[in-house]
From Swiss-Prot:
SMART domains, alphabetized: S_TKc (SM00220)
One GO cellular component term noted in the UniProt record for this chain: mitotic spindle
Entry's family note: Belongs to the protein kinase superfamily. CMGC Ser/Thr protein kinase family. CDC2/CDKX subfamily.
Name of the molecule in the record: Cyclin-dependent kinase 1
Modification N6-acetyllysine occurs at: 6, 9
Compartment(s) where it occurs, according to its Swiss-Prot or TrEMBL record: Nucleus; Cytoplasm; Mitochondrion; Cytoplasm, Cytoskeleton, Microtubule organizing center, Centrosome
EC number: 2.7.11.22, 2.7.11.23
Domain called Protein kinase: residue spans: 4-287
Other facts: As a key regulator of the cell cycle, CDK1 is a potent therapeutic target for inhibitors in cancer treatment.
GO molecular function, one term: virus receptor activity
Subunit structure of this chain's protein: Forms a stable but non-covalent complex with a regulatory subunit and with a cyclin. The cyclin subunit imparts substrate specificity to the complex. Interacts with cyclins-B (CCNB1, CCNB2 and CCNB3) to form a serine/threonine kinase holoenzyme complex also known as maturation promoting factor (MPF). Promotes G2-M transition when in complex with a cyclin-B. Can also form CDK1-cylin-D and CDK1-cyclin-E complexes that phosphorylate RB1 in vitro. Associates with cyclins-A and B1 during S-phase in regenerating hepatocytes. Interacts with DLGAP5.
Modified residues (Phosphothreonine): 14, 141, 161, 222
Residues the record marks as active site: 128 (proton acceptor)
Amino acid sequence: MEDYTKIEKIGEGTYGVVYKGRHKTTGQVVAMKKIRLESEEEGVPSTAIREISLLKELRHPNIVSLQDVLMQDSRLYLIFEFLSMDLKKYLDSIPPGQYMDSSLVKSYLYQILQGIVFCHSRRVLHRDLKPQNLLIDDKGTIKLADFGLARAFGIPIRVYTHEVVTLWYRSPEVLLGSARYSTPVDIWSIGTIFAELATKKPLFHGDSEIDQLFRIFRALGTPNNEVWPEVESLQDYKNTFPKWKPGSLASHVKNLDENGLDLLSKMLIYDPAKRISGKMALNHPYFNDLDNQIKKM
């Protein structure tokens, strides 16, 4: 830690306080995440340190790079590249009645997918994607932050400040208690973020797990074994769930053209095995008119 100076506290992440800092010799500005773990007394589990060390190898233009892992007084500090703005703050800053430019929505979605495909190809899941951990710079680049932390530290039910961790972007298989899940959980989250890029509003903003599920069911219909084999045997599936009929996504998501709605519907397919993959999503016709500069990144 002696290599870094803390400049100021910039926020509270899922796992602890985040500081803006500076490397004393290079002058590089960094984000310093102090990780608070549930079992403080025992120090940091070696499994977590192993997991985190692997993340230093995830180098991609759309991934916030982990530059250093430091221990101080049995506290773990993760040193990341610094970006000053997250997607939630940016969406909140757009004036009422105005929306993000449709070409920027497309560019951001493409970049998010590029980042996720890179990580998925290295068998790393995110599991907790949301606008707060998508960081943007002033050059139109968006980067995914906090990759792999869920596996290293688990996802707490509450942030250490007792704020509830958001469920809005969580996939139905996770909400229904599936013990086995994989890369499609991230695609679902990206689908809900895609809708929010277009509308500025969260697509499904539940305030509890059951409310979250019911909001999804009201929009997309209550799933059963016909549309999603085995769903009825998932741990938290109840035969007493109200049976909603599928509605139309277009009524929930204005501002997306036909191709955009088609891609969104493929990202929000109930059956994880049928949900579009990141790689397939990048080749969807929605991106046909995207600037080649972005495709080359």
